[in-house]
């Protein structure tokens, strides 16, 4: 691993029960880009071929507010499960509270490279000011499982959580 350490290292293991769960931007653009790529439709900027990442400046500005973080490369649910496992916590996601996905499949598709992070709720206003494209998508729980709730409050089940190379 290469890189320069900022003042504080944000690990996957830092999530605490009650923390808010955020993503830095909408999900599904990687999947849409891949579908266009397969059909040789290359007329628009393609998030699959050239993901737009957060700037170092933005990440440094968010750093004081984050308790844990991971990039969403293998699917939101799988990458969230990695934070939960490392933190020995669980999560509840409310997927239809805000329009951060186009379809349910966007939760497991991957290749989005948005930042998934947790933060104490007292920082919500600062996060919105620092990263206006972010979405508050759920809460970290003490119970070690992940629940995904639809707008009626029903728990959704998934056969797979995302892309697993192993």
Where are these regions (language model features)?
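Helix-biased detector of long, well-ordered alpha-helical tracts
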Residues: 1-166
């Amino acid at each position: 691993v290469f890189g320069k350490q900022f003042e504080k290292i944000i690990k996957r293991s830092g999530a605490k029960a009650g923390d808010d769960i955020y993503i830095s931007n909408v999900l599904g653009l990687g999947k849409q880009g891949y579908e266009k790529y397969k059909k040789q439709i290359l007329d628009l900027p393609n998030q699959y071929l050239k993901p737009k990442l957060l700037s170092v400046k933005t990440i440094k500005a968010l750093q004081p507010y984050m308790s844990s973080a991971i990039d969403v490369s293998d699917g939101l649910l799988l990458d969230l499960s990695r934070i939960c496992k490392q933190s020995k916590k669980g999560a509840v996601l409310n997927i239809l509270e805000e329009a951060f996905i186009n379809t349910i499949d966007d939760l497991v598709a991957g290749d989005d490279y948005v930042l998934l992070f947790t933060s104490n709720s007292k920082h919500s206003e600062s996060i919105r000011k620092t990263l206006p494209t972010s979405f508050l998508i759920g809460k970290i729980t003490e119970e070690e499982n992940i629940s995904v709730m639809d707008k009626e409050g029903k728990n959704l089940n998934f056969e797979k959580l995302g892309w697993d190379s192993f």
